[in-house]
Each structure stands twice: as structure tokens, then as C-alpha cells.
Amino acid sequence: MSKETDRIFAQPLAQVPDFAFNEDVVRVFPDMIKRSVPGYPTIVENLGVLAAQFAQPDTVLYDLGSSLGAVTQALRRHVRSEGCEVIAIDNSSAMVERCREYLNAQNSMFQELLPVQVIEGDILALEFKPASVVALNFTLQFIAPEQRLILLGRIRDALVPGGALILSEKLRFDDEQEHALLTDLHIAFKRANGYSDLEIAQKRSAIENVMKPDSLEEHRQRLLAAGFSKVVPWFQCLNFTSLIALP
């Protein structure tokens, strides 16, 4: 399937709308996220590797906020535990439609993949089945802050012994100098990937009202409050991190 170049914010906009995962974003999403999130391909592929270590037979592997299904595809490539299935859920109809197309293409290229359900829905309303792996890959930051602990508690309750939550997020930093440095370095990363200053500024204006990052310590304390016993950072590149949370 062809992948288009992200030019959504390339022209000056009189009024920058709030960012939304609509058809325009879906069309360029693979290019957008690769050029915007340092280490994204590494996180996604290794999410599958990590999941294979925690997957338990006859359980569900959840991809919450699955977008185009990159994590779901990685889970299916790496996990071989008997009786497992992947459930991918996203609230964007455009994302869900395209995700199903990508997964159908994956089915045609590989054999013996885990079965998968792709659901259009709200992860806050999801009735969890017993799960051994839950992936929240740059999803929690788009959920209302007051709902985050509730969701994590429900995930913790659904996890079976030996399972894990894998949480990837953009970080903010309480230290002003550290925050400014890593923000500037992230801007440099995006410039190096071909984004103009106009694109960077307009994307920031679009997303600042819908994405609310937390600090690493806020994530750690919230996960512990939700009932997780251990929080282990396994990846960080600039102001992006991924954590393993054990029940």
C-alpha cells in the first residue's frame, strides 16, 4: 500500500484546528509518526519481542489505541503462545478501516499468525477479558487526565500473573532546563526529517489542547497507585519513553 508524505501543516492556516485522527491524518500517518517520534520503529518492533516474553496461553493481547495496527502486526509476528488472540481497538473509524486493510495484507503474506479482532470503540468502555499483554502505545496522553488512573486500574485487574502492560508516551519534565533542552532537540529531530518551522509550529498548536503529556515520575506513581508492583523503563529517546509495568 502506498504511503503518502505528511504535508497537512505545510501551508499557513488562518485558524489551526485541534488535531484529530481523521481521514487526512490516516492517509499520511505512517510518514507522520516516523518523522515525528524518535525511535518509533524500534519501539514498535521490540514491543512484539517483549510481548513474546509475557504472553500466556489462552489469553488476550490488547492493542489499545491501535491506530493503523503497527503494534498489532508486531504482536502477531512475534507471539507464538497457544490460544492467544489480539484485540485492537481505536475510536477513529478512519483508522479502524485502514487498520483492517493492513492486517488483511499481513494475513496474505504470513501463515500461523495470531487471530485478531479490530474494534471501533472507546477503550474507556471496554470490557476486558483475561489478558497477558496490554499495549498502550502513545495513547494514554490523549485520554483525559482524570480518566487515566481508572483505565490503568482496569488494565491491572485484567492482567494475569506473568503478564505486563507496555506503555509508551511522550514525556514532559519538571526541570525547566531539561524540558527546554529536550524540546529543542525534538524540534531539531523533526527539522532533520524534513519538517519546516511552519509545519512544526502549526502541528504544535493543533495538538497542545488534545495531548497532555505526563512526567516519568507521574507515570510511575500512577501505575503504582493502579496496583502495578514494578515499573521498568526499557526505552527512551529524547522526550519519548516506553515502560514495562508488572502486575
From Swiss-Prot:
One of its GO terms (biological process) is tRNA wobble uridine modification. Its EC number is 2.1.3.-. Gene3D superfamilies: Vaccinia Virus protein VP39. The keyword Transferase applies. Keywords: S-adenosyl-L-methionine, Transferase. The keyword Coiled coil does not apply. S-adenosyl-L-methionine binds at residues 40, 65-67, 90-91, 122-123, 137, 204. Pfam families: Methyltransf_25 (PF13649). GO terms for molecular function: carboxyl- or carbamoyltransferase activity; S-adenosyl-L-methionine binding. It catalyses: prephenate + S-adenosyl-L-methionine = carboxy-S-adenosyl-L-methionine + 3-phenylpyruvate + H2O. It is an enzyme of class 2 (transferase). InterPro entries: CmoA, Methyltransf_25, SAM-dependent_MTases_sf. CDD domains: AdoMet_MTases. HAMAP family: Cx_SAM_synthase. Belongs to the class I-like SAM-binding methyltransferase superfamily. Cx-SAM synthase family. Homodimer. Catalyzes the conversion of S-adenosyl-L-methionine (SAM) to carboxy-S-adenosyl-L-methionine (Cx-SAM). NCBIfam families: carboxy-S-adenosyl-L-methionine synthase CmoA (TIGR00740), PRK15451.1 (NF011995). This is Carboxy-S-adenosyl-L-methionine synthase. It comes from Pseudomonas savastanoi pv. phaseolicola (strain 1448A / Race 6). The gene is cmoA.
